């Protein structure tokens, strides 16, 4: 017994000694844990790198940096002091809304000094930049490595054969480089390997499958983007190879087009739990063999655009399936049938991604999935009422039904108590948001935009975790009070735009939230400026346009948050000092103060601003201050003010300018030459000023689409560079100037030209015969698009874009008007009020897409356009006050869209062709043509109307003939009924028997309904905008 006591005492003392030595070694005095030899090796390694972001600032040989075990990214064995871990990986940083992400990478080359670290078992150098060099062979000598990650680090070349020496490796990640795989025999030596990624490598080895299956312990394999569609394993390889341990398989982006190219997956093992095949080119039916993978939990088939037939019935065998993603696969299937085929996973399924497909039907039966957490169904063709499908779903956290055709009232949302995000935008829901919304205590994002909802409940104010609320573009009405907003302490994005709401709060109300996005256009916030904005310190977007504010800017309003990006106060009646408002911050991207009562001199253009709108105000004086601008906006609109004086000649500094609108001011003098240096310019409006002199050259502005210089006093001839250099021009308006000379035929090279207005000048000579080269005018469709500028980036957490739509002053159907976005619907040529001579070229008749042609008030002779009947889209034709002669062509009657016609004051003769269309015009359309006759003018002398044709056939009794014509025989009716039943049941029978025909038929019906709905929405939206502008 005493022996055991002494033995235990000795063991205790020994352990205590070890602990004392370890503590002393690690913490005592000035003694360092780091070994000198390994410190020197690490410093040599550092010298081979370029550290632009100070990742290795803690590394050094200074006295206070001697302990290398405390350097960033270094770990040591606490007992021996040997370096065991080097972790210098970087992470991508993606700023909100950025199209690309950034990583603060190390650059340079790897030093073989790492070989001195003989106990190194963990090396992570991922997401760095090693100059597209080959992976150093010496890494294959770090034999104790268990973890090696060189992914996304700009390596290239072949994988060193020396990797076969890394027999202790459990994780090897070489993905996202530019490696070439010619030999994989080294893999068979890595008997402990559990994770392997060779993603984005260029496979040039035919026996890759055979070699990979020689790694018996492999659990996860990533071969994404390796071009495996061209390297299908042979049947012999499939028969003799397997990977029983494999659980997770990544095969994204391999250009697989059919299941035969990845059928080897089903030979590997039946134990797979996760497969991703997203971003391939799969087509046809989904392989039934997925249903044999009884352990499958995760299946991703997203972004394969040609999958047909939907979910196969074999998926009912996947009783462990937790995650299924078939988004953006163009799947056409009846949704209730799809849910039925997933019934085997009704207890396990947690995430179901079906967005961006062609699913139809209602979402009934969605409640059968008792574990469902996330359901993505946006951008389909779902219809029916939400109420039909509502049932208690206590687990659902994310539901997206946006951009469908669902209708009716919303259900009691308290049925979804776990919801964190609810997206119902762009449907046809009606009624009020249910009172039960207030019970969703975990709700963070609520989007009900673009529906027909009418009211907001006060229970909204109970959503203390709500971060984003978007109810824009509904028909909400009534008053929002403090009760609606009382507890929304987490709210950062509020969008109630384009409703009929009034926001009424007490004068000293302090909101419980700090918003990043405030979007309240068309909400009634006035007449006074909303004082609660003074409490908001973090917003990046402030849009209170159309808000019925008629007040002077308060002094506190100029103290903006430093990150403000969008400021929109347009369409109010606000007055005050603009200079204080926009000169106190450098973060602006968009400033829109248009349609207000601001006055005074032009303020300096703020630094970094991209869109700057001051139009429809009362600014006055010179704009020479623009030369002091330190920024180059993308879009600048100063139109409809009282600016005067000469235009400054400093535009060469605004190199980014794409839209410049200086119309409707009092500018005088010549157009400065520096405007011609704006190589990014797409639209230039300077109409209705008093500019004089000749046109400067815009030949460098080769992207110019709109050139509107009408209503000035410009002189000289039309320059040839318009036709040779401005080949993208779509609108050319030089109307109401003092130009002379002939119309140069070189402008016929403008194949994209849609609107040509040279009216009211002094142009002479003949009309060129090449107008049929205007390709867009030759096409009989509307191909116009608005000019659109998107401000890059997210503001708050959510994307925003800003749209610029230009206008044009044109003579359309005998009325001079301004048209917003004329490129969408106008195709016109106006050469009126000049001194043109000669005949009208017959080539004009080839312009079948032309909608308005005005050649009036010239000295043209000859006949009305030969072949004019081809111009079937023509709505307005004015050839009055010329010297045209001859008869009116008969095919003029073919122009069924023609609503304005004026051929008066010519020398036309003969009878006006007979048609309901031509006789419906007023007499003034044909007046002052001395020899023209026929309705609606006086009848032609001696004209006798043609007699009705009478059938003198065998039946000599007209009454009997009429009866025979009027009453078909009984046999006719019987055959008609039989034909209807045969056709009806024949088509219906095919739809019942053939599911693919049935799906295609219903998809056609749904597509047609969607198209009609979309068209009606577009026209309704345009009508709303016109009505708002009219107000």
Swiss-Prot record:
Pfam family, one: LRRNT_2
Residue ranges that the UniProt entry lists as topological domain Cytoplasmic: 993-1031
Residues annotated as transmembrane: 972-992
Signal sequence, start to end: 1-29
Glycosylated residues (UniProt): 30, 149, 165, 240, 267, 317, 365, 383, 487, 538, 568, 597, 653, 666, 773, 781, 854, 861, 894
Membrane topology: Single-pass type I membrane protein
Single GO biological process annotation from the record: defense response to fungus
GO cellular component: plasma membrane
Stretches in topological domain Extracellular: 30-971
Listed SUPFAM superfamilies: L domain-like (SSF52058), RNI-like (SSF52047)
Predominant cellular place of this UniProt entry's protein: membrane
Region (C-cap/acidic domain): 919-971
Compartment(s) of residence: Cell membrane
Ranges where the record places region N-cap: 30-113
Listed PROSITE patterns: LRR (PS51450)
Alphabetic keyword roster: Cell membrane, Glycoprotein, Leucine-rich repeat, Membrane, Plant defense, Receptor, Repeat, Signal, Transmembrane, Transmembrane helix
Keyword Transcription attached: no
LRR repeats by residue range: 117-140, 142-165, 166-189, 191-215, 216-240, 243-266, 269-292, 293-317, 318-341, 346-369, 370-393, 394-416, 417-440, 441-463, 465-487, 488-509, 512-536, 538-559, 561-584, 586-611, 612-629, 630-654, 655-678, 679-703, 705-725, 726-750, 752-773, 823-847, 848-871, 872-895, 896-918
Binding partners and assembly: Interacts with EIX elicitor protein.
Family: Belongs to the RLP family.
Function: Involved in plant defense. Confers resistance to the fungal pathogen T.viride through recognition of the EIX elicitor protein.
Protein name: Receptor-like protein EIX1
Higher taxonomy: Eukaryota, Viridiplantae, Streptophyta, Embryophyta, Tracheophyta
């Amino acid at each position: 017994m005493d022996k055991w006591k002494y033995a235990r005492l000795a063991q205790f003392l020994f352990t205590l000694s070890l602990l004392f030595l370890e503590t002393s070694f690690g913490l005592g005095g000035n003694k360092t844990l780091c070994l000198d030899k390994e410190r020197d090796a690490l410093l040599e390694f550092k010298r081979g790198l370029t550290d632009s972001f100070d990742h290795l600032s803690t590394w050094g040989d200074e006295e206070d940096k001697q302990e290398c075990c405390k350097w960033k990214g270094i770990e040591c064995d606490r007992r021996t002091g040997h370096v065991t871990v080097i972790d210098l990986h970087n992470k991508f940083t993606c700023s909100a809304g950025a199209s690309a992400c950034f990583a603060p990478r190390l650059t340079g080359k790897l030093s073989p000094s790492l070989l001195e670290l003989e106990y190194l078992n963990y090396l992570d150098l991922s997401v760095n930049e090693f100059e597209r060099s080959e992976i150093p062979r010496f890494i294959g000598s770090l034999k104790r490595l268990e973890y090696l990650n060189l992914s996304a680090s700009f390596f290239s070349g072949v994988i060193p054969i020396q990797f076969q020496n890394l027999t202790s490796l459990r994780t090897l990640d070489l993905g996202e480089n530019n490696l070439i795989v010619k030999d994989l025999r080294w893999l068979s030596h890595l008997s402990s390997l559990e994770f392997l990624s060779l993603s984005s490598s260029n496979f040039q080895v035919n026996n890759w499958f055979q070699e990979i299956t020689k790694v018996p312990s492999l659990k996860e394999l990533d071969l994404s983007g390796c071009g495996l569609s061209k390297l299908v394993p042979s049947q012999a390889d499939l028969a003799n190879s397997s990977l029983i341990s494999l659980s997770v398989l990544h095969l994204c982006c391999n250009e697989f087009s059919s299941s035969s190219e990845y059928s080897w997956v089903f030979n590997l093992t039946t134990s797979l739990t996760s497969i991703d095949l997203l971003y391939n080119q799969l087509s046809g039916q989904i392989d039934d063999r997925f249903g044999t993978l009884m352990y499958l939990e995760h299946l991703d088939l997203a972004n394969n655009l040609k999958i047909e037939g939907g979910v196969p019935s074999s998926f009912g065998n996947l009783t462990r399936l937790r995650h299924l993603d078939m988004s953006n696969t163009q799947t056409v299937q009846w949704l209730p049938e799809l849910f039925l085929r997933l019934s085997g996973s009704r207890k396990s399924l947690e995430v179901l991604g079906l967005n961006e497909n062609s699913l139809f039907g209602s979402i009934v039966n969605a409640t059968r999935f008792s574990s469902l957490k996330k359901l993505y169904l946006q951008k389909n063709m779902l219809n029916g009422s939400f109420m039909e499908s509502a049932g208690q779903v206590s687990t659902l956290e994310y539901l997206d039904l946006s951009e469908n055709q669902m209708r009716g009232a919303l259900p009691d949302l308290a049925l979804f108590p776990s919801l964190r995000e609810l997206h119902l935008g762009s449907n046809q829901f009606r009624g009020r948001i249910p009172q039960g919304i207030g019970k969703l205590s975990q709700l963070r994002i609520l989007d009900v935009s673009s529906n027909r909802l009418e009211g907001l409940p006060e229970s909204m104010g109970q959503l203390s975790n709500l971060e984003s609320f978007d109810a824009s573009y509904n028909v909400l009405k009534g008053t929002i009070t403090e009760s609606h907003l009382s507890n929304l302490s987490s709210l950062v994005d509020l969008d109630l735009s384009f409703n009929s709401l009034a926001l009424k709060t007490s004068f000293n109300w302090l909101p419980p939230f700090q918003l990043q996005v405030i979007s309240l256009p068309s909400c009634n916030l006035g007449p006074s400026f909303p004082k609660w904005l003074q409490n908001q310190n973090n917003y990046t977007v402030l849009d209170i346009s159309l808000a019925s504010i008629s007040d002077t800017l308060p002094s506190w309003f100029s103290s903006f948050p430093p990150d403000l990006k969008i400021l929109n106060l347009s369409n109010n009646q606000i007055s005050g000092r603009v200079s204080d408002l926009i000169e106190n911050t450098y973060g602006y991207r968009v400033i829109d103060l248009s349609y207000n009562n601001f006055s005074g001199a032009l303020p300096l253009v703020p630094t970094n601003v991209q869109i700057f709108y001051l139009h429809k105000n009362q600014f006055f004086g010179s704009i020479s201050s623009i030369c002091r601008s330190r920024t180059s906006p993308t879009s600048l609109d100063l139109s409809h003010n009282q600016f005067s004086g000469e235009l400054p000649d400093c535009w060469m500094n605004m190199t980014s300018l794409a839209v410049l609108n200086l119309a409707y001011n009092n500018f005088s003098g010549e157009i400065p030459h520096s405007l011609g240096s704006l190589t990014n310019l797409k639209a230039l409006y300077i109409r209705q000023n008093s500019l004089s002199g000749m046109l400067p050259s815009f030949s460098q502005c080769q992207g110019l689409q709109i050139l509107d210089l009408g209503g000035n006093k410009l002189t000289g001839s039309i320059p040839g560079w318009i036709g040779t250099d401005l080949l993208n021009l779509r609108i050319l308006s030089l109307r109401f100037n003092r130009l002379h000379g002939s119309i140069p035929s070189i402008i016929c090279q403008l194949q994209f030209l849609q609107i040509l207005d040279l009216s009211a000048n002094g142009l002479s000579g003949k009309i060129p015969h090449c107008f049929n080269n205007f390709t867009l005018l030759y096409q009989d469709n509307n191909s116009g698009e608005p000019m659109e500028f998107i401000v890059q980036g997210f503001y708050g957490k959510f994307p925003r874009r800003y749209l610029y739509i230009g206008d044009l002053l044109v003579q359309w159907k005998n009325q001079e008007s301004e048209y917003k976005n004329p490129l969408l619907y106008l195709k016109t040529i106006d050469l009126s009020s000049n001194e043109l001579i000669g005949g009208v070229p017959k080539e004009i008749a080839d312009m079948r897409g032309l909608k308005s042609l005005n050649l009036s008030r010239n000295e043209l002779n000859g006949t009305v356009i030969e072949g004019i009947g081809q111009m079937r889209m023509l709505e307005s034709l004015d050839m009055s006050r010329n010297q045209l002669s001859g008869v009116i062509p008969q095919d003029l009657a073919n122009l069924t869209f023609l609503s304005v016609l004026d051929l008066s004051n010519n020398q036309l003769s003969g009878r006006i062709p007979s048609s309901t269309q031509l006789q419906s015009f007023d007499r003034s359309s044909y007046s002052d043509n001395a020899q023209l006759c026929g309705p609606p003018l006086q009848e032609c002398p001696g004209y006798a109307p043609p007699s009705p044709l009478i059938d003198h056939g065998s039946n000599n009794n007209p009454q009997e003939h009429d009866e025979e014509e009027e009453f078909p025989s009984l046999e006719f009716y019987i055959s008609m009924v039989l034909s209807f039943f045969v056709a009806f049941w024949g088509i219906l029978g095919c739809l019942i028997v053939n599911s693919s025909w049935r799906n295609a038929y219903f998809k056609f019906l749904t597509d047609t309904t969607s198209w009609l709905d979309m068209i009606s929405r577009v026209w309704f939206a345009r009508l709303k905008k016109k009505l708002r502008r009219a107000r």
